[in-house]
Amino acid sequence: MKTTVRQLVTALGLTFVVAAGAAAAPIPELVTKDGRHALMVDGAPFVMFGGQAQNSSNYPLALDKVWAAIKDANANTLEIPVAWEQIEPTEGKFDFSYVDTLVAQARKNKVRLVLLWFGTWKNTGPSYTPEWVKFNNARFPRMLDQEGKPIYCLSPQGEETLKADKKAFVALMAHIKKIDDVQRTVIMMQVQNEVGTYGYARDYGPKAEAQFNAPVPAEVLKHKKSPVALAATGTWKQVYGDYADEYFHAYSVAKYIGEIAKAGRDVYNLPMYVNNSIRDSLEEPVKPWNKNFASGGPTFDVIDIYKAAAPAIDFAAPDIYSPDSRKFVATLDKFQRPDNALAVPEMSNGADYVRYAYLVLGRGAINFSPFGIDYADYSNFPLGHKATDKTMTAPYGKIFGAFRPMERQWSKWAFEGRTYGVAEGDDRQPQKLALKGWNATISFREWQFGEAQYFKDVKDLPANTEKPNGGVAMAQIADNEFIIVGQHARVKIDSADGKPTMWARVEEGRYDAAGKWIMERNWNGDQTDYGLNLTGNPVVLKVKVGTY
């Protein structure tokens, strides 16, 4: 018998009723200790080994292709949109059947959810707003350019727009609470998507102009000092000079988002964050906006302004679509702060990016989620992978498959500051990690046997190393014990005090469901004489070292 969407939702409703009799799990929350952060799920640290669906897969009949890709990627979390246009196509009339279907299917697939609220802004534009918003400029005003002409972007000064978006978001949060207050399948919310404005520094409408020419709010002055020697107080231009337009726009957008987030959290207090299309992380010194990124978005230079204007937002996170290794590392450096959790909620799914899983996870991130983990017939090449099949998901599946059996242990170690990570740089050079009492050297393009100087006439290089794709993540679980997972890399560990060092034991294995280490074999001889040589098939090693 063919099952209709109505029948499916009815059946799902029964599932929710049954679940309501169970004891509620603790609500997810973001916690901070000693400048480190953890997402607590079911009362314990939880790292999202995730994947983000395509933008148009947020409909019940499209989900099968999403779940298939998430399964092949071995992901524990799906990020997927919930669009304003789909839950409130007619003003005041809400339809949450998609949300019901999504949550029920996530439970069936044993996957957690991060819901992406595509409301007023998606990639700076209003394309996911309902039609009754899109075409009513009188009620829902667009930003105005310097000549007073409306542009593509809805104004953050639009009071009616804010009121309507907030109403829809609150209704969504209330519904999530209704169906998920026990099982906590939904663990986090993204509020809007890649906000700001391309090509325009800010809104020049009457309300915006009045605020721009008024004194900078005290909460902003407290968080964001002037990058140049200007007035300590005054108007935006007086305090921030050439940076004033971007900073004011960031404040306006952040305040708008913050009001929506707070209203939603007042109903159901899930963690919430904002993402952004990043600016050049290598630019030093950071220059004023010059049409080179989305002005007003939560780029690294205005995180402080977002903290001031939107305290209901837990953190700002980068969407990364540049494979340049120096920029990637610099971006993580800019966003990983004592007051800002590191997360990469969106990244290219291209082959050049796979190696960064080890770097991001090793640095203690709470989320690593490539974009387009979805078998829908759409490829975002050249930003992403050419194909939308298993050739795209398999590399992530191998890595996540290595981490997932120890996901709770890894999450705990990361929160305790015990984890480290590297990704092979574009220069292909060895990298060092300063561990507690030890130094690790990670090199790349090495054969498993011998040292390069032994075989100077050998010109061959290991297969699949034509481009940088190596990486290693480590956790120091005791003074002289480590968990190592990686690919296409050689790992050596030496004592930090210079004493001769040797391997005491190198076990290959895994953690079982109860958290017990299961050894499959012990490496020795050729497998350890020249460091620990990791191939393209990620393995998990439990390593003990000593000095003599």
Predicted regions and their residues:
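Bacterial N-terminal signal peptides
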Residues: 9-19
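Catalytic-core region of carbohydrate-active enzymes that cleave or remodel glycosidic bonds
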Residues: 111, 258-270, 301-409
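Polysaccharide-binding and catalytic clefts of secreted carbohydrate-active enzymes
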Residues: 138-303
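Aromatic- and carboxylate-lined catalytic core of secreted/periplasmic carbohydrate-active enzymes
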Residues: 358-493
